[in-house]
Amino acid sequence: LLQVCNENSLFKSEARYLVRRKDPELWANVLEENNPFRRQLIDQVVQTALSETQDPEEVSVTVKAFMTADLPNELIELLEKIVLDNSVFSEHRNLQNLLILTAIKADRTRVMEYINRLDNYDAPDIANIAISNELYEEAFAIFRKFDVNTSAIQVLIEHIGNLDRAYEFAERCNEPPVWSQLARAQLQKDLVKEAIDSYIKADDPSAYMEVVQAANKNDNWEDLVKFLQMARKKARESYVETELIFALAKTNRLSELEEFVSGPNNAHIQQVGDRCYEEGMYEAAKLLYNNVSNFARLASTLVHLGEYQAAVDSGRKANSTRTWKEV
């Protein structure tokens, strides 16, 4: 029968017959590479026979036959006809998956079009396969389309390596977890001011130790004050409050510092006073030593400030030979 069809160019009839027979062996026979009529037959399967059927099993056997014959480009033609041309199988999840995956393997230029046109595929799985095949823009497009925004920005940061685009994306979707991911990446690149802005937008103080270290190293004191004020609202950590006092001293916000230490807090005020003293920030040190009634250190600080009368008064309160000698 196949021979008669081939000899008389009855490829349309042959294609319909093969689709309805659902016989893998017959398919294997006609899809062999040495069949001189293979191309004409495939054209009729794609254009006519398969688009006429409404039987899922007929579609399944035909698709498997093309896969078994290792004809990825022809399989793409076949699946395009079924999935993209509004057939009854257009929304079939496995066929949509197969079309995209076959394109990833055989014709990468089509992948982006399929991703954008189709809506019913296994997005996270397909995106991860795209990543493993270095199709990063395609993976980003999938995650963005299905609103998996944390994964989308991860692709921009880790695979595409473009923090400017990551920032634009974070601005557009404006979700705290997305800002947090961006902030972590910015901090790793030593973009301290930008990282702090992102952490504040995320309302996420979790990386406070790394932020403090980076801000100390890069002298981002103004930004650090903003970050630690946000962090303090979320967690009354002793470390956060201690570093906030020091940052206020570094930015010369002495009235805010005085107000802070006068209220309830968990800060190590003595420790910050010593740091201020060592860095020559005597006005701040004076406020802090006064707050913890450390009259010996206060007397030394007042001497540095040239406030000798007050230094004598503090020396008297300290009642220490060493302090008297210094004064």
Give names to the regions the model predicted.
Residues L1-V327:
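Extended alpha-helical solenoid/arm regions of large eukaryotic scaffolding proteins
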